[in-house]
Amino acid sequence: MTTQTSTGLRHQTVLLDEAVDALIWRDDGIYIDGTFGRGGHSRRILERLGPGGRLVAFDKDPAAITEAGTVEDARFAIEHDSFAQMARCLDARGVEQVAGVLLDLGISSPQIDEGARGFSFRMDGPLDMRMDTTRGITAAQWLAEADERDIARVIRDYGEERFAVQIAKAIVARRGQSGDRGPLDRTSELAALVAQAVKTREKGQDPATRTFQALRIHVNQELADLETGLKAAFDRLEQGGRLVVISFHSLEDRIVKRFMQALARPEQSAAPELRRAPLRAHELPAPQLRLLGRVKPSEAEVSANPRARSAIMRVAERC
């Protein structure tokens, strides 16, 4: 589904039918869309729900909240918050259990394509990178104040960038210059600085890709939110409820895979203890999730939407 947003920007929802097919197992349940984005998944979920079904969506982005205002359906509600706050928000609505939770972790095309948001190294704009532009510090503010070692750590750990130390040194050195060469505050400035600091290029990838990813993850606390959100989602799932997660890079997918496998195969996480005390095997907790598989976009989808190439969808069911 290609969504035309209220601002005229277009967004192609990744793994639309696959995600909704995996999520909906009864049409009268309460479902969660953890990232409304531009509404592709939410609108398809509402199409599949019966009169007794309900959908609660979350998003940190004010633009997404505005877009959600165009959904005229009494079964739908939107929360301007991170899905990491799912438990608190559902408590406020009196919702104890849900039939399914969908987390689409990708950044939306309108966010990337709007230069003023600061997510893209391909166009000039303020170095912002906040999903929620109403709160928190921008990437520019953090880079102007952070310690060189912290900058290197973030770029290395969240961007898996092997030139993280060199990039951090260049960023800090830039802060000490005066005039137009002062602290970074434009995406084009950061992209140019990284291009100079990175000594070798990966085929088909801009040298700034990993650094921009790392800063976006850090500014928005994406991995911490993911870990909190996964636990909150599992805690709310009713028996038979589905957890569907679409990730777009290895850091996200690693967290999702580890979380699901720990609940589906408790004997693996307990293996070291069992080797020391094998008679305790009968004390192992029963599996709490059933793994239903992993799905990647088809060649046809990737051809139509190259941004879908890195997507991986994992599905699990509450036992």
From Swiss-Prot:
Primary location: cytoplasm
Q: Which UniProt keywords apply?
A: Cytoplasm, Methyltransferase, rRNA processing, S-adenosyl-L-methionine, Transferase
Coiled-coil spans are: none
The EC number(s) this enzyme carries: 2.1.1.199
* Compartments in which it is found: Cytoplasm
Superkingdom of the source?
Bacteria
Task: Name the positions where S-adenosyl-L-methionine binds.
Answer: G39, G40, H41, D59, F83, D104, Q111
**Keyword Metal-binding in annotation:** no
Q: What Gene Ontology biological process does one annotation of this record name? A: rRNA base methylation
Protein name, per record: Ribosomal RNA small subunit methyltransferase H
- Give the source species: Ralstonia pickettii (strain 12J)
Q: What is the lineage of its organism?
A: Bacteria, Pseudomonadati, Pseudomonadota, Betaproteobacteria, Burkholderiales
